[in-house]
Amino acid sequence: KTMKSLVIWLGLSTFATIMTLPAYGQNSDIIGPSPYNYVTDSWMQTFAEEGMTFGGTSGVYVQNKGRIFFLQRGETRLPNPIPQSYAGFPASLGWNVLQGRGRVWQNVIYVANSEGEVLEIWNQWDHLFKGTNGPGPHRLRMSPYDPQNRLWLVDETNHIIYVFSNDGGRLEMTLGEKGIPGKDETHYRLPQDVAFLPNGMFLVGDGLGGNNRIVVRNADGSYHSEFGEGGDAVHQFASVHSLAMGPEQKLYALDRDKRDVKVFRQTAVLDSSDYPNYEYETTWTGLDLPLDITLGEDAAWVTDIRPPKIVKYNLDGTQDYVWNLPTEGPHMWIEMHSLSADEEGNLY
């Protein structure tokens, strides 16, 4: 069977590789056979001006192999002179760019293809993030039901969500009020993610700043309903860091601080008056500090840290395999914050 590629481009280490798992897996605690080919070769074309390098990359979304969207928390200004330890990404200098060291809010959104060639840089929107004091933009998503393929950007620090046209020419929707946190029908507090329903409605994971809720909104952005609460019970949240939809419209909500994934089943019929209605089903455990989840037809992938790793789950909640990422050397990782898959099953 031809092995898929695992194109890694996310995390505070901020570099891109394709990794050959069978060779690397001797030291990576793989459970079960891996279908991925993992080769430690540079992948992403660099485009930063002299004296600058990538920032902390927080989001990726693969529309197709010819159009892959990336979100970075600004770029990083390099010291002068550049230390010999510099290997093309800030973590090689021992920097955690999430803390903002050397950050310049520029080239936040860009588009590349599966060869790592940069196609577009959306610097016309950098002004939305200038002056941000904190992690800033957190996640990129796109609805599989949207014929316009609009790009959704969740800005955690500014409590706001932006929706752009696919070519970056228009800002088509804004949800929340920039810099104003809250817990009502129009405000969020550190929103983390969005997920999409077949009828155009969407869900907002509003759960890192104590709100501990998932907000349901109509296709036009108006408020519909919400569910979720904080607490120690298995169905309650400590945080809602990532959302993903799976088969049968099940919702998978990743709780970073409880270190688990909560699964909710859809109990209402599409287009009925009580749609959507989610009922807690089960919780997946066995994680250390999970950050993102993505679903396929028969499996789920979770990025986890402590140590940095990727975990594959079967949809019954059992772990299929786990592999750790290198934490030393030229391809080291501090964390992998997000991942996305293309039409051939390659993970980015």
Regions found by a protein language model. Give the residues of each.
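Bacterial N-terminal signal peptides that target proteins for export
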Residues: K1-G11
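Eukaryotic scaffold repeat domains enriched in small/polar residues
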Residues: Y24-Y348
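Bacterial N-terminal signal peptides
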Residues: W9-T20
